[in-house]
Amino acid sequence: VAAVGALYETFLAEGFEGAMVRVPDAAYVYSRKGYHSSVLLKVKPTYDAEFRVIDWETGTRGKAASAIMIICETAAGKRFAVTPAMEIADRNALAAKMPIIEDNGKTYFDNVWRDTMITVQYAGLSVDGVPLQPRTRMQTRVDEPVAAAAAAD
């Protein structure tokens, strides 16, 4: 295991995105029908960080064509779309709910999601500092207003 870990770290240092490891003592199995072998494991780093939610949109292709995508922003002001880790039907339902005007005259999105901090998992950063393959479980953290935090002290 230590040898595999050392090779993995070497691959990452050389710019590779990870390593493929075959299960010990397993025979080599060719990919069938374009799927990976069950004895071949992909080892890649996963990072997570919190980003501010600034908008939302729907997907444009395939089965995610009407499913929600969350738009976040990096500290440097770069915007990127994040895929929620939800079933497509649930993403569609959330997309339908976002523009609904609530009793206070604001949208559901503005009341619940805008300016919240959301935890995003990603595979690394692009050369522009944008998360690659970003996804989220829709876990948010709402910051206390500065005035309320100061009053509590």
Task: Tell me the role of every PLM-derived stretch.
Residues 148-153:
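Acidic, low-complexity intrinsically disordered tails
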Residues 1-130, 134-143:
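Nucleic-acid 5′ end/cap handling module spanning
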